[in-house]
A protein has these predicted regions:
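Short, charge-patterned binding micro-sites
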Residues: 81-107
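Short loop/turn motifs enriched for small/polar and acidic residues
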Residues: 23-27, 85-87, 144-146
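N-terminal beta1-alpha1 ligand-phosphate binding loop
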Residues: 46-77, 83-87
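N-terminal, polar/charged subdomain of small-to-medium soluble alpha/beta proteins
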Residues: 1-49
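A generic structural signal for short beta-strands and their flanking turns/coil linkers
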Residues: 18, 36-38, 75-81, 98-102, ...
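Flexible, gly/pro- and Lys/Arg-enriched active-site loops
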Residues: 46, 91-99, 110, 116, ...
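Hydrophobic C-terminal alpha-helix "anchor/cap" residues
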Residues: 6, 10-11, 71-72, 119
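Residue-level signal for inorganic ion chemistry
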Residues: 6, 56, 82, 172
Length: 186
């Protein structure tokens, strides 16, 4: 819609703009009702998300770098910070190669669901195959936090389940967001 496109264009092009409320009115709209105007009002804003990334197959760094680049090139997404890459032992299924892991901080206009779809597209572009739970992967991208939201849906859990027990998440999170509080565990 006009309001959606205008809000996105303004938020993406004006660097200091964090939130916008737009009201679009059309006087004497032909809607078949005795109204002087018809209007739509929307509010859109930038959201802060933290994304865990990892790989333990092939050229791990290349897969991660390409995933981050793809995310940075996504309309309505801005990468703000990237942790160091850490070499870590596998979690869950331990009979596999070491992982290269890290975390990034981003700002996005995407909803949590839209962001999840985009992360899955980037994983698919890296030829990720979901054969074994916690098994080897070319690229793994997970939403850790999205603002301070708590979401519990079949395919999306924010904050990410069990992140507080995973050093491969906690160490890079501490590097880029040492004072961030978990919205459930505080």
């Amino acid at each position: 819609s006009l309001a959606e496109n205008l809000a996105e264009m303004l938020l993406c092009s004006l660097s200091g703009l964090e939130k916008i409320t737009l009201k679009i009115e059309k006087p004497w709209a032909p809607v078949g009702l005795p109204l002087k105007t018809v209007s739509v009002e929307i509010t859109r804003k930038w959201h802060t998300a933290y994304i865990a990334f990892g790989s333990n197959m092939g050229d791990k760094k290349m897969y991660i770098d390409n995933g981050i680049r793809g995310l940075a090139e996504t309309k309505g997404c801005r990468i703000e910070a990237i942790s160091d890459y850490l070499i870590t032992e596998p979690y869950g299924v331990t009979d596999q190669d070491e992982f290269l892991n890290g975390v990034l901080k981003m700002r996005t206009l995407l909803t949590p669901g839209e962001l999840l779809v985009r992360l899955h597209q980037l994983e698919q572009a890296a030829n990720r195959e979901r054969i074994i739970h916690w098994g080897p992967r070319t690229l793994d991208l997970d939403i850790l936090f999205y603002d301070q939201e708590i979401i519990d849906m079949p395919d999306l859990h924010i904050p990410h389940i069990d992140l507080h027990n995973r050093d491969f998440v906690l160490v890079p999170m501490n590097q880029i967001a040492p004072y961030l509080r978990h919205p459930v565990l505080n």
